[in-house]
């Protein structure tokens, strides 16, 4: 009896066990969490998943595309669960959710804050949520884009500055050197600085030697949201 001929494996998408886009993106995010963004590569992702690099390209076409998907994945839970609420409550909740998402993965902060490639992970639901909140606030169509840019620019700017990366090498040495620089600032000629520097040291932008992963700026972020919301309200009142 003739032996059965082996079936040829069909061409097309690779059959690696349970390989999906979500697994690839999650693995990429895990690698970015544990190393520097600059050294991240698709080969590293393939190695961590025990597949050939060519298998990755069935799901993402390039490193840039994958990085965009990583941002979308890391920020997937930033939209508040209910849209049927006051726009100020929604906006405040969204800002806190966005910050917590980036705090969990601080190595994506420079990707979000300074690289256009992060836009490849565009989330229509996130943009729609912000626009819906602004429309509920009363912003007319001709001003809603400016208000949207204020929110996104300010939010991303604060978070990425708060979580700014320390020097890649000799972090402890750099931190000690900057602490000394701060302590040696000329407070004699700058009275406001002399008064507030003890409170600001390592707790305020420019005069800190730890970033937000070690010394989070919680109360400053709360005030930041208050200012943004009040500013939006005042902007509406001024045009009426």
Where are these regions (language model features)?
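Short hydrophobic clusters on alpha-helical segments that form packing/core surfaces
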Residues: 24-32, 70, 74, 98, ...
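Hydrophobic alpha-helical bundle segments that form small-molecule/ligand-binding pockets
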Residues: 126-182, 232-240
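N-terminal intrinsically disordered/low-complexity leader segments
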Residues: 1-18, 194-208, 240
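A hydrophobic membrane-anchoring alpha-helix module
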Residues: 213-240
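Hydrophobic alpha-helical connector segments
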Residues: 79-125, 141-144, 148-151
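Helix-turn-helix
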Residues: 23, 27, 31-65, 69
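Core domains of carbohydrate- and sulfate-ester-processing enzymes
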Residues: 179-196
């Amino acid at each position: 009896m003739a032996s059965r001929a082996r079936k040829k494996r069909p061409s097309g998408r690779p059959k690696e066990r349970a390989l999906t886009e979500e697994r690839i993106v999650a693995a990429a995010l895990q690698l970015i969490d544990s190393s520097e963004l600059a050294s991240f590569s698709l080969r590293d992702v393939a190695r961590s998943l025990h597949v050939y690099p060519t298998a990755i390209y069935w799901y993402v076409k390039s490193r840039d595309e994958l990085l965009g998907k990583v941002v979308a994945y890391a920020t997937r839970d930033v939209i508040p669960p209910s849209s049927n609420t006051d726009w100020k409550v929604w906006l405040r909740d969204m800002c806190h959710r966005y910050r917590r998402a980036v705090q969990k993965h601080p190595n994506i902060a420079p990707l979000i804050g300074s690289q256009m490639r992060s836009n490849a992970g565009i989330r229509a639901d996130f943009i729609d949520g912000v626009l819906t909140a602004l429309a509920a606030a009363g912003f007319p169509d001709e001003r809603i884009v400016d208000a949207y840019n204020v929110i996104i620019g300010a939010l991303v700017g604060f978070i990425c500055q708060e979580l700014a990366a320390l020097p890649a090498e000799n972090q402890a040495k750099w931190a000690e050197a900057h602490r000394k620089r701060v302590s040696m600032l000329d407070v004699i000629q700058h009275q406001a600085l002399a008064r507030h520097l003890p409170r600001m040291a390592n707790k305020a932008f420019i005069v800190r030697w730890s970033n937000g992963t070690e010394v989070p700026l919680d109360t400053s972020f709360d005030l930041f949201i208050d200012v943004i919301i009040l500013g939006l309200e005042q902007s509406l009142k001024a045009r009426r």
